[in-house]
Amino acid sequence: MQRESFGSRLGFILVSAGCAIGIGNVWRFPYIAGVYGGGFFVLLYLFFLFAMGVPVLTMELAVGRASRQGAVKGYQVLEKPGSHWHIHGYFCIIGCYLLMMYYTTVSGWMISYLFKFLNGTFVAGMDADAIAGVFGSMLASPGEMTFWMAVIVIAGFLVCSRGLQSGLERISKVMMAALLVLIIALAVHSLLLSGAPSGLAFYLIPNVENVVSAGVGNVISAAMNRAFFTLSLGIAAMEIFGSYMSRENTLTSEAVRISLLDTFVALMSGLIIFPACFTYGIQTDQGPSLVFMTLPNVFLNMSGGRFWGALFFLFMTFASFSTVIAVFENISSFCRDTFGWSRKKAAIVNCLVVLAASLPCVFGYNIWQNLHLIGGRDVLDTEDFLVSNLLLPVGSMIYLLFCVSKWGWGFDAYLKEANCGDGIKLPKWLKPYFQYILPVLILIILIQGLI
């Protein structure tokens, strides 16, 4: 059977960027940037993004494009006879399932809040306790959380069942275009608020005092981690899109475009958050408390708050759902390639599997709220720890070693594939950096995540 392919270069870039752009761009990056020195952090982040993230992204894409296969089979096509690199492919799929076991729940929160702003659950004059109560009530209701999680899962597999070009590519183009329009509109609105100058100063102006206070080592570490994790590398989520892409452009050119689009969304998120928080004197935060308590409080303090709140959660729904459908495509592709299933069968079976597998995360906030797993973490944090702190860095290290070592695919074969087409070409003199320095940087991230 002939391998499907993207209908356009734009489609590939938007689908891949949609996979990278996620909740962390909004609820983690801006806060970390502000606390860890503003402009200093942003510059360090960009340095590590291009020094670490882009090279590993080209490697994952190269394995996919050269093999025209996804996880497992991509390794099998390229590895030397008798070697076992392909075993990592199975861990990639496990990582994708684990990621969806909690990401679908959090994505359900986004669409739930979109409807709460539309239906009048949030109204002007609500105080912080009432706003926090809405979030607490949602978490305490397994029925409500299961419903919205199921909406995300079913919608995601419906998109994938329609095919690559008719489903994933078409929907991603529309969502990503809408996402960019929404984030620009929200940022412009925030920049017109009275607290915009103070918010921008905190966010973007280099702050030596914050760097010293946080510790230079901690600032560098935070920039490395954020730059590495933002591209969702190490679990074949990008490899599958490499298997669908053309050979007309170099992989470095495409990786740079994906990374810049991801960075644009992260930076713009801060332009939404900080001017608004400084205008209304509300303490900034990160994580779920920022999105589901701090920002609703901000929106309800401003004129037309329900409208702006609805727009923000529509943006967040698109940001999270774009990641969901991208990872679903990887899972679906694995089942089609391994078991010979049709797209429709792969979508139906995986829809049922992910629905069932996502329930522990839902129940972890209510029925199983006293359940504590690795290091006392709840269900969601345990699943996130396994993916973010273990599978992503280990997987990235394996892709790196496969592409640069003589026991794997080999650096020359990787470089030939990466430089195929028009655009930015990687020079051969980078080989020592890829072989000796980049593995050390990834190892540092892995160790930091485990201690």
Range-by-range predicted roles:
Residues 1-27, 56-61, 65-78, 82-87, ...:
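Membrane-interface "cap" regions at the ends of multi-pass membrane proteins
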Residues 2-6, 169, 173-321, 325, ...:
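Membrane-embedded translocation segments of transport machinery
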Residues 3-4, 32-36, 66-91, 104-165, ...:
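Inter-helical loop and helix-membrane interface segments of multi-pass membrane transporters/permeases
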Residues 5-16, 41-44, 83-97, 146-152, ...:
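Select transmembrane alpha-helical segments in multipass membrane proteins
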Residues 11-48, 236-242, 252-256, 260-261, ...:
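Transmembrane helix-boundary motif of multi-pass solute transporters/channels
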Residues 11-13, 19, 146-147, 261-267, ...:
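Loop-to-transmembrane helix boundary motifs in multi-pass membrane proteins
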Residues 320-326, 347-365, 381-415:
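Hydrophobic alpha-helical segments of multi-pass membrane transport proteins
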Residues 373, 377-401, 423-451:
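A generic transmembrane alpha-helix motif of multi-pass inner-membrane proteins
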